Amino acid sequence: MRLPVIQGVIRRRILANFRVDAQAMQREIPARFRPKLQNGLAIAGVCLIRLEHIRPRAMPKIVGLNSENAAHRVAVIWDEGGESCEGVFISRRDTSSQINHLLGGRVFPGEHHRASFSVMESDSEISLKMNSDDANVRVEIAGRIASDLPSTSVFSSLAEASSFFEGGSLGYSVTNDPDRLDGLKLQTRQWQVEPLEITNVYSSYFCDETRFPKGTIEFDHALIMRNIQHEWHSADDLYV
């Protein structure tokens, strides 16, 4: 799917990340992909992002759209043209925007499900809840800005985690065609993340023991980005 370059502001982006048994994660992604591993574990999670002033690059800010969005994703690698590629596989997108819901998968990449979002935030704290209109997905997260990752994280430092996720700028989302994924690449003017000290985290998808049996998944850490100028560039579809 091709679309013009889209630009705007990432007002707030939370990456809530889980460490997952690699075999359990492989069962949840298309066979063409392999989990990208960190110390032998797959890394998956929810991207919770507030986008503002989203519009084609040639258009003024005043026409831009604002929305809250959630994407369930996993870091993956795959082979193409004899080379190893990396990105994220996005199994589901949810949005507060009716426009995103109607046009996603048709005019721009990725099907988007309608959802309601409740957000309370300050400079140092945030609490966010998301419930999909189809009642299939629920996400909660609450926390405050921290100085470092939890000591239990699979990443040895904030810099290591930042580099891992910066490499996942190319995302492939499910469509109504089970053999085709829509591609979209994020380009940021700067890449800067801060750790969050989490007091509550829940994802109905990642807490589903029919998908991830007990002992195969644990919450690892969360990161936040704020006030980032960015662009979205379409990428070639990927057939699985």
Enumerate the language-model features and the residues they cover.
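Long, hydrophobic/aromatic-enriched structural stretches that serve as scaffold segments
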Residues: 42, 49-80
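Internal, well-folded beta-alpha domain core
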Residues: 11-13, 73-240
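N-terminal short leaders/motifs
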Residues: 19-34, 69-87
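N-terminal domain-onset segments
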Residues: 1-56, 191-207, 218, 224, ...
